[in-house]
Structure formats: C-alpha cells, structure tokens
Amino acid sequence: MSEPASTATADHYVWGEVCDGWHLVRAENLSVIEERMPPGAEEERHWHERARQFFYVLEGELTMQFDDRAVILQSRQGIEIAPGLPHQAKNTSNAEVSFLVISQPRSHGDRQT
C-alpha cells in the first residue's frame, strides 16, 4: 500500500552547497523531487540524454535559462524540458523558491554537462 509522501519523511540531500532536495518518489521510471533554492543559487547548465523533466514552482520565482532565452516561472507555473535540451535553473529573485522536479525516467546518472 502506498503511503503519503512529504519532506518530513522523504530522503533529504544537499546540492550546490546551499540547496535542498527531498526524494518524494524514487523509482526507476519516475522521480519526483521537491527542491529549495535560496536567493542567488543556481545549478550547473546541463542536459539529460533520456529523462524528460517538468519543473513546477510551488512558492517563489524560478528562472529557467536556455541557450537562447530565459523563462521566469511564478508560483503555480511549470515548464517541460525535453531530453537533450540544455537548461539551468536559477533563483535570481530576493526570496527562496521551492519547486517540484518530475523526471521520467529518473534523471539520476543521466546528467550531461
């Protein structure tokens, strides 16, 4: 039987020295992670060979940088990232941002820089 998932019970990890992530769903064919980024934080520009991702902002503002443009996502907005598309999530605002990263299949081990 499935159990409710939350950041209180999920496996936690730190990335980029100042950002947090919680594995809400961790399966071979699906990953759902809640992440938190403080102001000024950003991930390394990268792409995934197989994983299709969907970033969905829960609170705050997230900038998704692509080669040719930047997309600013507000609370309750999301964006799909196709496999092979270079991208970089950034928090260029003055407030913390929390968001979901949904990957299918999971993106662990699939990241290219």
Where are these regions (language model features)?
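Short, conserved beta-strand element in jelly-roll/cupin
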Residues: R36-P38, H48-M64
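Short strand-connecting beta-turns/loops that link adjacent beta-strands
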Residues: E28-N29, R50, N94-A95
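Short acidic-glycine-tyrosine-enriched beta hairpin
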Residues: D68-P83
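A short, N-terminal "cap"/entry segment at the start of jelly-roll beta-barrel domains
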Residues: M1-I33, E44, D110-T113
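Structural motif
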Residues: E61-T63, A70, P86, E96
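Histidine-centered metal-chelating micro-motifs
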Residues: E42-E44, T63, I79, P83-A89
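Ligand-binding loop in jelly-roll beta-barrel domains
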Residues: P83-G109
